[in-house]
Amino acid sequence: MNTDNGMILITALIRPHMEGHVVRALHDLADFPGFTFDEVRGQGRGRGQGGAYVVSDEDITYHQYLELRLVCPADQADEICRRIEAAAWTGRKGDGVVYTMPVNTFARIREAGAKEHRHD
C-alpha cells in the first residue's frame, strides 16, 4: 500500500440532472480517473422566506444531490475540479459544492491482491 502517493480525494455534490454533463467532462480527460456516485440529500446555507429558519417535524425538507467521489494525482486535481464546476453549473442557488482532501494511503485491491498471491 502506498502511503506517500500525492493523491487527492475530490468530492462534489451536484444536481442530479447535471450528472450527464459531469460524466462527459470526466470522460473527456486524457487520464480518466474513474469515479463513484451516491444519491444523497441535505440542506445548504439558505434560509426560509424573509431570512427566518423555521423547522418542525412536519416541514423538514431536503434537496436531492448526487455525491461524486474520485481519487486522482495531486497535479490533476485543480483541472478536474474546474471541469466538474463548469459541467455542473446552472447559475442557480443550490448548484452544489466541490472540495478536496489529501489521501494518506491508496491501493488498488486487484493489484495488491496479485502481489499477495504471486507464486515466484
Where are the predicted features?
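Positively charged, small/polar-rich N-terminal and surface patches that mediate targeting and assembly
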Residues: 1-120
